[in-house]
Amino acid sequence: MSLWPEMATGEFALKTVNAGGVRTRYLEAGRRDAPAVVFIHGTGGHLETFNRNVFEHAEHFRVLALDMVGHGFSSKPDHPYEIRHYVRHLDDFLDAVGADRAHLHGESLGGWIAAQYAIDHPARVDRLVLNTAGGLNTDEAVMKRVYDVTMNAVRNASLETVRKRLEWLVHDPREIPDDLVELRHAIYTQPGFERAMENILCLQFMGVRMRNVLTEESLGRIRSKSLVIWTDHDPTAPLATGERFVKAIPDARLAVLEGCAHWPQWEAKERFNKLHIDFLLGR
């Protein structure tokens, strides 16, 4: 298994753009005049989170996937990254790539960002997909686990510790190919990345988290038709959390992808791609 066969048979471009002063690495595929869909990764992640989804979506959409501020190979300004900073970066990115309006897909932290963006900028969001999203969970044990396994992969970076971090995302560890481990190891061993990860992980501290959390009241202001995707083995929050999102968002429905953990777009690509594309197309 490899990270790259998924990307070998279609056309795409890896680019960088200045998004509000943040040098932002992103992937683009599909027709520029097609409706845009933006894929937003989770904590410590990068755009390759969505390698298994790009070309199926590019048949219908202008696909954009980016390394969020502080993440991947994008710029890493030295300050703690709270949700408002990610929301501002996403808004600047949409401006920079000329996408006035887009579907948003957010995985984990990306779902937290996407939900808050839909609350703050409703006119710019078409349909919204929250994939095992953060933002409601305030379980200190989970927060500590995220912090510990992530910082260990950075402070003691090796192929083994990085693999352990990635395997935490999936139900079957065989889903993690060696070259994905090598890519993330390259990201985690960039000069200064330990400091960047400390800034990323500020949301795992309760005081910071509580001033950023989503609430039923704030989710009730989302006007986009929404799909909440959950799994039966998610390590960050139970299915009940997905149900809370659906109950709070006025026009939302729930889909559960079984046999998956925290990366259903990767673990169950065929089921995910069909579900996701059908939803975005209104089928």
Residue ranges, per PLM feature:
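Conserved HGGG/HGGXW glycine-rich cap/lid loop of the alpha/beta-hydrolase fold
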Residues: N18, V22-F73
